[in-house]
């Protein structure tokens, strides 16, 4: 009851990002490919199709009901980025740089804001991967890291090197940092 974790991807990733700004019930959370700033994402396109992203905020998934100029407060209130200071839950974020559905700068914005405020957070990016990692080695890596993350926060297991020290960009794919620190 006191060791609850939560995970979601895409729309679910947004829901996790939003949820942790409203409650501290979760001991750890993973947010995959989240939209965290509906105002900046509104003006974007889906990179793989070139379609406008505006419709999804106005009438489909987000159901805001109109444009940011008609309902600025709704866009503001539904964008987790503006409530980062209220997040107390450790967060693992996965957002890939070839994501054609959700602009990956949304994940970067989220991560950089969390780190700026000293919040425990990690960003995983699988270079060249789209909305969800399709290469088996990336899926395996993601599952290992997600399990280590939740095991650390929910079961009190030792922290792995990648969470404690990070992995320098030049060592990506060479040194995984899976080793647990005693």
Labelled PLM ranges:
Residues 1-182:
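Active-site-proximal cap/loop segments of hydrolase catalytic domains
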